[in-house]
Amino acid sequence: GRNTTVERLEFTGCRVPDRNGAGIRQEGPGLTVRDCVFHHNQDGILTGAHPESDIVIEGCEFGHNGAGDGLSHNVYIGRVRRLTFRGNWSHHAGIGHTLKSRAETNVIIANRFMDEADGTSSYLVDLPNGGRAFLLGNILQHGPRAENGTAVSYAQEGAVNPVQALYVVNNTFISDR
């Protein structure tokens, strides 16, 4: 779709044989998701690469998504122009990341990224292509069963976005590992 808005829905049980079944799978430009719940899917939200796409996700809960292979995540944003991720609770990613984004600009504000006591996430926030990223006022907690100890990963797959700048301001990091 193009310029899609989704509000106040629950997505659960989305699975396909190639292990990337998503509550929402967006290939076109423009996506706004508000006040939704995504749980027990292979991916909560999965988007393609679209250079003119702006994505806004706010007030949502993502939990227990992932196929357990480390390649599926609570939220996986492809190479888009901008992601705004605000006021969400992303927890219990099944070995994948609670948020993975390849966006050129990421504005990540006032979220909770949590493993709790029994979560097994990998990175809490993965920005594999770097870019301009603002992490402001978030709570990031790795539980004792987390797959690894990295809370925020930046440009680990190559700094290919045009601007490289990471701002981490007024966040709370908790490691229970």
What positions do the PLM features span?
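Glycine- and acidic/polar-rich repeat regions and solenoidal domains
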Residues: 1, 7-177
